[in-house]
A protein has these predicted regions:
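Active-site cleft segment of glycoside hydrolase catalytic domains centered on the general acid/base Glu
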Residues: 236-239, 266-382, 395-404, 490-499, ...
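Extracellular carbohydrate recognition and processing domains
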Residues: 116-146
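Aromatic-rich peripheral "rim/lid" segments of glycoside hydrolase catalytic domains that contact
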Residues: 191-192, 406, 425-459, 463, ...
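Extra-cytoplasmic beta-strand recognition segments
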Residues: 35, 80-107, 135-139, 167, ...
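Aromatic-lined substrate-binding rim segments of carbohydrate-active enzymes
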Residues: 206-265, 273, 329-352, 400-410
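Extracellular carbohydrate-recognition regions
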Residues: 25-50, 173-183
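Extracellular glycan-recognition surfaces and repeat-rich motifs
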Residues: 36-76, 209
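Glycoside hydrolase catalytic-domain groove-lining segments
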Residues: 354, 365-443, 451-452, 458-466, ...
């Protein structure tokens, strides 16, 4: 996959017929895309050819749709390709799509597309055995009347399996425009002596600017949280302006994460800033407007146009409890007033900046529908739907895919996974227990290793890339730079606290860049 650029508007035209690059005009035809043509299970399905361990590829009953599917399985180790070449194509970009699933053992199953300029590949993500996922891969054809080869590949240990169904080849390019990292803890880390190093595989472990390291590995955006009056003097508007300037110098776009609190805000805690504690609803509305405008203008003063601003953080339960809560008691009209004030402030500061509304539990479609049905009924404007998705808390990829696809279709808004992470180890590097530190918390197929961390992020990006009509923007890896630095703990009122997150950062316990960072290069 090709690297895209996150500049100007945070939303670049994406994929599938509306790509920023010219889409091919030809409508390709895949023969026997659902493996139904033979009417029974066969060794070699009509329209497809095999190579490698040919006995490991066959069709059988149990399709994602229809009756049959392509399956790869063998009692011994195997490597097999089942492919089809589509000819007579015009020059341009093409995207292959397939529904797939695989076992969780040693099993490199993938969808490949070769249009003559090299093989592009998307791996089949790990999911429960009964869960099909749709994945996509794009490649460019550089000559008229050319051809593209769709390849369904498996290299696996004996007994491991993969299934494929409903193959498509369509004109256009499915490329993510946001490959981001939350670096909210970075400034405080640096102030307390934190250092960051390139990975030893390619850069000899040189000490460098963390933002430059991220950008060199393919990241094109950062996310910065903003508290109103934090106890430790970090994560405030002044720091936002400084980090925004540094991000611009490093070639990174900026997403502003407004918490509307003096400390952490999430579904369970949406505490008003102390200075706003006794405000009326009218005063809170004005305070939201003023704070949002001030945050945005602080960046503009540094020559930075924020690509996106999110109004609140994980606001399933609302903001500014209890006045803006969605339950106990529900105050949807008040919440709508606050969000409308924030939206107005962003657009006054920068009309092209996108406004995001962000919920937790990215695979919970019922909650997302309930929340956005209520907020749209109140007439709240917004541009992007953001979702937190941590696989160990929020479940497998299937519900995430269903929810992202549904949000894009139901509300006509682009979607982004705005928080995600996974551990590279179960060890710890300070005196604070880690948020994820037990083997029982891990997901089968994603070990707590550098490779498991990278595979987890890769597969989440694949799900966002597959959102139809280019409506999936990308993802931000949460607090990628939060290594264990004394003084940079989770509690802004307690300098002795640890961070509980160092085993999920994008830098290891020696502050070296981890392989997960390479997933920024699609």
């Amino acid at each position: 996959m090709r690297k895209s650029t996150f500049t100007g508007s945070c939303v670049l035209s994406l994929a599938l017929g509306i790509s920023g690059t010219a889409a091919a005009a030809t409508t390709p035809t895949v023969v026997n895309p659902g493996f139904e043509a033979d009417g029974t299970g066969v060794a070699t399905p009509t329209g497809w050819t095999k190579s490698g361990s040919v006995d490991a590829s066959f069709t059988e009953f149990g399709g994602q749709s229809g009756s049959f599917r392509l399956s790869n399985w063998n009692p011994e180790d195997y490597s097999v390709d089942t492919e089809q070449t589509v000819s007579g194509l015009d020059r341009g970009w093409y995207t292959a799509r397939v529904w797939a699933r695989r076992s969780t053992g040693s099993n490199d199953a993938s969808l490949e597309l070769d249009c003559g300029s090299g093989v592009e590949r998307t791996y089949v993500p790990i999911a429960p055995a009964d869960e099909w996922l749709q994945i996509v891969v794009s490649a460019r054809l550089d000559r008229h009347h050319g051809s593209c080869t769709i390849r369904l590949h498996s290299t696996a240990a004996g007994g491991e399996w993969s299934n494929y169904d409903d193959v498509e080849l369509v004109p256009g390019d499915a490329t993510l425009s946001i490959l981001g990292a939350d670096v909210s803890s970075l400034k405080k880390s640096l102030d307390f002596g934190g250092e960051y190093f390139d990975d030893e595989r390619t850069h000899q472990c040189r000490k460098r600017d963390a933002l430059e390291i991220l950008n060199e590995h393919g990241a094109n955006a950062i996310r910065l949280r903003v508290w109103v009056n934090p106890a430790d003097g970090h994560h405030n508007i002044r720091e936002l302006a400084e980090m925004g300037r540094r991000a611009k110098q490093a070639g990174l776009g900026v997403l502003v994460d407004l918490h509307y609190s003096d400390t952490w805000a999430d579904p369970g805690t949406q505490t008003k800033p102390a200075a706003w504690a006794n405000f009326s609803v009218d005063q809170l509305e004005k305070a939201v407007f003023d704070h949002t405008l001030a945050a945005c203008l602080s960046l503009r003063a540094e020559g930075v146009t924020p690509e996106m601003v999110q109004l609140g953080n994980e606001i399933n339960s609302g903001i500014l409890f209890p006045d803006g809560s969605t339950w106990n008691p529900p105050n949807w009209p008040n919440l709508a007033r606050f969000l409308k004030a924030g939206y107005k402030a962003v657009k006054l500061c920068s009309p092209r900046t996108k406004v995001m509304l962000h919920l937790a539990s990215g695979g919970d479609n019922g909650t997302f529908r309930w929340w956005f049905d209520n907020i749209t009924a109140q007439g709240v404007d917004f541009d992007v739907i953001g979702a937190s998705y941590y696989m160990y808390w929020h479940g497998p990829l299937g519900p995430l895919q269903f929810n992202l696809n549904d949000m894009a279709q139901r509300y006509g808004k682009e979607v982004v996974v705005v928080e995600t992470a996974y551990p590279f180890t179960l060890g710890f590097n300070d005196n604070e227990n880690n948020s994820i530190g037990l083997q029982s918390q891990l997901i089968d197929g994603y070990p707590a290793t550098p490779e498991g961390q990278a595979a987890n992020f890769r597969d989440i990006l694949s799900i966002v890339r597959a959102v139809p009509n280019g409506m999936g923007l990308g993802a931000y890896y949460w607090d990628a730079t939060w290594t264990a630095v004394p003084g940079n703990g989770w509690d802004p009122t307690n300098p002795a606290s640890g961070d509980s997150w160092e085993n999920q950062a994008m830098f290891d316990f020696n502050s070296r860049a981890l392989p997960v960072m390479d997933e920024f290069k699609p």
